[in-house]
UniProtKB/Swiss-Prot annotation:
Has some calmodulin-like activity with respect to enzyme activation and growth regulation. Binds two calcium ions. PROSITE patterns: EF_HAND_1, EF_HAND_2. This is Oncomodulin-1. CDD domains: EFh_parvalbumin_beta. One of its GO terms (cellular component) is cytoplasm. The modification N-acetylserine is found at residue 2. GO terms for molecular function: calcium ion binding. Ca(2+) 2 binds at residues 91, 93, 95, 97, 102. Keywords: Acetylation, Calcium, Metal-binding, Repeat. Residues 39-74, 78-109 form the EF-hand domain. Ca(2+) 1 binds at residues 52, 54, 56, 58, 63. Coiled coil: none annotated. The lineage of its organism: Eukaryota, Metazoa, Chordata, Craniata, Vertebrata.
């Protein structure tokens, strides 16, 4: 699966442009601009599986660091503060990782 199978390349490019500089990544803005927030719960879970590098069923901080690169290979890494903020926004049960349900809830919040 390619991310452009489910999201428009133009929308992805626009979303990445908005957070090009370090410490400018805002999850909800990214989800809206990329079109992710308009997708069904099942489609969001498909994107989650694409982002889940090790197919563990969870996203940890290391995977989140490379979140933008899953949308475009040349994109920047998230900063440590952006990574921690993204984790805090989605990790509802406080276990230090984001499951598919938590990810879907964050995207649609």
């Amino acid at each position: 699966m390619s991310i452009t199978d489910v999201l428009s390349a133009d929308d992805i490019a626009a979303a990445l442009q908005e957070c090009r500089d370090p410490d400018t990544f805002e999850p909800q803005k990214f989800f809206q601009t990329s079109g992710l927030s308009k997708m069904s719960a099942n489609q969001v879970k498909d994107v989650f599986r694409f982002i889940d590098n090790d197919q563990s069923g969870y996203l940890d901080e290391e995977e989140l660091k490379f979140f933008l690169q899953k949308f475009e290979s040349g994109a920047r890494e998230l900063t440590e503060s952006e990574t921690k903020s993204l984790m805090a926004a989605a990790d509802n049960d406080g276990d230090g990782k984001i499951g598919a349900e938590e990810f879907q809830e964050m995207v649609h919040s």
